[in-house]
Every structure is written in C-alpha cells, then in structure tokens.
C-alpha cells in the first residue's frame, strides 16, 4: 500500500474561528545529497490575528492558488519556522510576500546556511511572544536537547 495525502492539498481548511490548516504535497528527506524514498506529508497552520494579519506556521511548498486564497483571509504577515526542520519553503513565500516577517527558531539559521537554503530570516523567536501576536497567540519553547521547538497556543 502506497502513501496517501490528506486531500485536497493546497486548500485552506477551516478548523475553527480564525484558524485553519493547509495540507501540502509530499516531501522527501535528503541525506548527504541522496533523496530517500520515504515520503512524508506536510501541513501548515494559518491563524488570522485580531488585526487581520495572518500567522503562517511551517509554510508548505508555495502555490499561487493557495496564496490567493489566503490573501482573501487577511494579510500574510508572519512566516514562522517552529523548529530547525520546518523552514524549507519560507523563502518561496517571502519572495511573493516581501513585507512578511520571517521568524527563525533556534538553530534554523545555521541549518539553512549549511544546506544553502534560499531563505533570509528577519527576526528570531524568543521565549515571550512578540507584540505582533501576543494578544492572540501564546508560545513556549519545548527544550528537547538538540531538537528545540516552539509550540504555539491560539
């Protein structure tokens, strides 16, 4: 049995007031330049803040139709990497939305640089939520040794 996606992909799926998810295409892990035949699903979360800015958590591969759908929900303002693995497509989104703030989690800048990723981060996530989403989203850093991840609560 092959792997399957959470259809439909690249479509915003409302999960509650001002929050939804978008399932993306399969991704494949590459180690030492070798693409492994192990597909994994991708998903991003979109939160509309009280000022109508959008908080995009772990952006999936960019798709123009999805970007247009999200424009109808609000202004894409925050592109957030919750950990050093979920940043791969932030660069694609930031090229289309250059006014968006790109948020780096611990170790993501170093990992992106080592992998020659085409992404520039404008701010670093800190323990306390930034003023930009403090009224709508709380956050905490989950310390897992080498792997640290920000967890967000809406």
Across the structure, where does each feature detected by a protein language model lie?
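Metallo-beta-lactamase
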Residues: 106-149
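A short secondary-structure junction signal
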Residues: 59, 91, 114-116, 148-153
